[in-house]
Regions:
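S-adenosylmethionine
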Residues: 1-292
């Protein structure tokens, strides 16, 4: 309780300090009685008077709540200056990114993306509840994720494999480029295949996407050689690039994870490449900032 309240005082500004202390005292009294409440109150009041409370943390691990494992990797790969910039950027709130399925759609409170014509940006909002989302005129998809489908240079008639497809954002985006072509979307788990199907139906591209339960490291064994004109390998990775939206990711990583993921990624690429036609294109994408 003390740690949580001190963190709230130091790093969160929506609740006044006096209110944070008062709430902590009430919780302590309710849980452990008046003596504990008096102790909590004394410690927090003393901390508020302390000359140290307004000091900037001297290390990145404390200031940005970033584990040493990830900090060391960042510094090795990017250097100190760039690492500081990355850490600062991760503290900023993430915006909402939409993909236009209907190119004529206009959504109040959004602005055009500078990265891609397909994206609209908003500072906040629950767009999944809008009529435009429900009717399949827009979907929620990160800007950078929307850069992937154009890289496959789809002309309309291709046989496409999305090797690691869930939840289906890139599959449905690729489907927008197809006329007579077709996408086979793979995942290991039934509930994730259901997500792909739901997204495809909402966006009215279910006739262009077939989901299949399969291990992406066994693509060649499943489909044989020279099967696909285009293959997307949106490989499983550490997901460090998603920290702003999923801050808990940073606390669930061990050094062995990066080595294990590299092996899986290579197995997927090796197997997928054997099922690619000789004139085909394979695109490899991840949502991490690290080399691994």
């Amino acid at each position: 309780l003390l740690l949580l309240t001190v963190y709230q005082i130091l790093f969160m500004d929506k609740v006044p300090t006096s209110a944070a202390v008062d709430e902590a005292v009430k919780i302590a009294k309710r849980r452990d009685g008046q003596a504990t409440a008096n102790f909590i109150n004394a410690v927090l009041r003393n901390f508020m008077r302390s000359e140290h409370r307004n000091e900037e943390p001297k290390d990145w691990e404390t200031k940005y709540s970033m584990p040493k494992l990830l900090l060391d990797k960042m510094v090795r790969q990017f250097g100190g200056k760039r690492t500081g910039e990355i850490l600062e950027s991760l503290e900023k709130p993430s915006h909402v990114s939409l993909r236009k399925i209907d190119p004529t759609v206009e959504i109040a409170g959004t602005r055009a993306s500078l990265l891609t014509e397909s994206a609209l940006i908003a500072d906040s909002g629950n767009f999944a509840m809008t009529e435009e989302f429900q009717s399949g005129k827009i979907t929620i998809q990160d800007e950078t994720s929307q850069l992937v489908a154009p890289q496959l240079d789809l002309e309309g008639a291709e046989e496409v494999l999305d090797a690691c497809a869930a939840p289906g954002g890139k599959s449905t985006h690729m489907a927008q480029y197809l006329t007579s072509g077709h996408i086979t979307a793979l995942d290991l788990y039934d509930h994730k295949l259901d997500l792909i199907n739901q997204n495809a139906e909402r966006q009215h591209v279910e006739d262009k996407i077939t989901t299949q339960k399969a291990d992406a490291t066994m693509i060649f064994e499943e489909f044989g050689s020279d099967k696909f004109d285009r293959i997307l390998v949106d490989a499983p990775c550490s997901g460090i690039g998603l920290i702003r939206r999923k801050p808990d990711i940073r606390y669930r990583k061990e050094s062995s994870d990066f080595v294990d993921l590299q092996k899986i990624q290579l197995e997927i690429l090796n197997s997928a490449s054997k099922s690619l036609k000789k004139s085909g294109i394979i695109v490899y994408s991840t949502c991490t900032i690290f080399d691994e």
